Curated annotation (Swiss-Prot):
Superkingdom, taxonomy of origin: Viruses
UniProt-annotated stretches for the region Disordered: 147-172
Biased composition (Gly residues): 147-159
Lineage: Viruses, Varidnaviria, Bamfordvirae, Preplasmiviricota, Tectiliviricetes
Protein name stated in the entry: Uncharacterized protein D-172
Amino acid sequence: MRSDVTKISPRRIIYPLSPAPFNTPCKLNIISPFIKLTSTHSANKGVNHTRNHRFTPYGLGRLQLKSKGCPDSLSKSSIHSTAWRRPPTLTATGLMGHSGTTGCISGGVLEGPESQLSVLLLHSLDTGDVGRLRIAGTNLGRRVGLAGSGSGSGSGSGSDTGPFKKSQYKIL
């Protein structure tokens, strides 16, 4: 087993992710069935917030996330998402930036139906907008390509702890 992998259980492994540069736009690619997610959050002007997100992955194959350059549309207020044939789940950690920043994600690999991983996410605090996320995927279990995208919106909620905020993303 890799030295940088933390074994939680035979079906739950954490792969630490390299932090992406702050304010660096990127794209989230998912190899597995599609997932649809929304966010719940609120934000204070000019404050950086740390967010913890919980997903629940299940389905065939494994999920692989990696960072890539993404379009300016990531700074929009609604979240860009896709719909899974079967709802997977995963655990992610996000970081929000100042107004005008775009979504920033650092990727890793999920193994098994109850895997965990960390993700960096930046989006506007001045408006509380959720950065747009563009997601693409493939069902590795059936070797079926499922390219496509959809859209969804997030609602605001959450509580501040000092200069940080905790909030959630959920699978629909």
